[in-house]
């Protein structure tokens, strides 16, 4: 397993769009990828719509794969919180994608709202946010106060999904 930071970006973004099922992402786009032993994508975190105070984050993973690790978690949050030093990241998820909503909630994202009819097909978009200080306090964060702690994915946060 190998983490790529920005290499194969175009290929990674195209793969993530196919997995997530979305066409466009606004602004400059970059990606951090996790590859299997054959060099194929296991997971990709795509970043878009950087404003100086926020960046959108999209996470795509190969279905039925075991890809989430502390190292990929920290690699994914390194760009927004340690390099760009934005105060927040935003996760945008289709309303019907309950698995993704549960997943980001477990990562510590907070539900922030619903954009009705945000997609061309009339579908709603759910907004989730994670603040820099929430990431730094996260049990998996590579932060001097939490380094060395572990927690299973299911215990990271609640499974609450908003209406």
Where are these regions (language model features)?
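Acetyl-CoA-dependent GNAT
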Residues: 6-54, 63-64
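C-terminal "cap" of GNAT-fold acetyltransferases
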Residues: 118-163
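Conserved acetyl-CoA pyrophosphate-binding loop and the N-cap/start of the following alpha-helix
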Residues: 68-76
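Conserved catalytic-core motifs of GNAT/GCN5-like acyltransferases
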Residues: 92, 110-125
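Conserved active-site alpha-helix within GNAT-family acetyltransferase domains
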Residues: 96-113
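A short, internal acetyl-CoA/4′-phosphopantetheine-binding micro-motif in the GNAT/acyltransferase core
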Residues: 58-68, 94
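A conserved beta-turn-beta hairpin within the catalytic core of GNAT-like acetyltransferases
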Residues: 48-59, 85-87, 124
């Amino acid at each position: 397993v190998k983490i790529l930071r920005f290499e194969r970006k175009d290929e990674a973004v195209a793969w993530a769009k196919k997995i997530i099922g979305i066409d466009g992402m606004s602004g400059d786009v970059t990606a951090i990828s996790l590859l299997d032993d054959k060099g194929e994508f296991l997971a990709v975190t795509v970043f878009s719509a950087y404003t100086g105070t926020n960046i959108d984050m999209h996470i795509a993973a190969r279905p039925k794969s075991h890809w989430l690790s502390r190292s990929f978690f920290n690699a994914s949050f390194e760009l927004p919180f340690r390099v760009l030093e934005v105060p927040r990241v935003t996760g945008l998820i289709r309303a019907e994608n309950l698995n993704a909503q549960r997943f980001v909630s477990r990562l510590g994202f907070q539900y922030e709202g619903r954009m009705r009819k945000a997609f061309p097909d009339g579908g709603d978009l759910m907004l989730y946010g994670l603040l820099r200080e929430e990431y730094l306090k996260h049990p998996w964060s590579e932060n001097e106060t939490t380094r060395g702690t572990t927690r299973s994915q299911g215990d990271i946060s609640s499974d609450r999904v908003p209406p």
